[in-house]
Every structure is written in structure tokens, then in C-alpha cells.
A protein has these predicted regions:
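Residues in the recognition helix of alpha-helical DNA-binding motifs
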Residues: 9, 23, 34
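A short, Lys/Arg-rich alpha-helix, primarily the initiator
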Residues: 1-12
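DNA major-groove recognition helix of helix-turn-helix/homeodomain DNA-binding modules
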Residues: 44-59
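Alpha-helical residues within the helix-turn-helix
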Residues: 11, 22, 51
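Short alpha-helical DNA-recognition segment
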Residues: 15-30
Length: 64
């Protein structure tokens, strides 16, 4: 399932996939795969993404 919440939060912060990837130390392809729903990130990666985007795990990764 696509992670549109993560993409929306990234765009709202005016960050490209590459910029977010550089901030958290992963490849742009990893960010793309997470947003497309092709990759299930580790909890540590989820936390790093949340910190950079100013969101909680619930806001970005939990469905509800």
C-alpha cells in the first residue's frame, strides 16, 4: 500500500526524495520504495523519517 501520508509530509516540508534520503542516511531509491509501498522500513528508519518530517509514527505509518 502506498504511503501517501509520508509523501505528503515530505512535500509539505519542501523536501525532495533525495534531500530526505540524505538527511536520514539512506538512498533515494529507499525513500521512493517506501512511498510506493514496495519496501517495509525498519522501526529505526521509521523513527528517523518521523523526526525529519516532524510527525509521529502513528501519523505516518499506522493505518487507522
Amino acid at each position: 500500500m502506498k504511503n501517501l501520508k509520508m509523501k505528503s509530509a515530505r512535500v509539505a516540508k519542501d523536501l525532495s526524495q533525495q534531500q530526505l534520503a540524505d538527511l536520514i542516511g539512506v538512498s533515494r531509491q529507499t525513500i521512493s520504495a517506501i512511498e510506493k509501498g514496495d519496501y517495509n522500513p525498519t522501526i529505526n528508519l521509521c523513527i528517523a523519517i518521523c523526526r525529519e518530517l516532524g510527525k509521529t509514527l502513528d501519523e505516518l505509518f499506522w493505518e487507522g
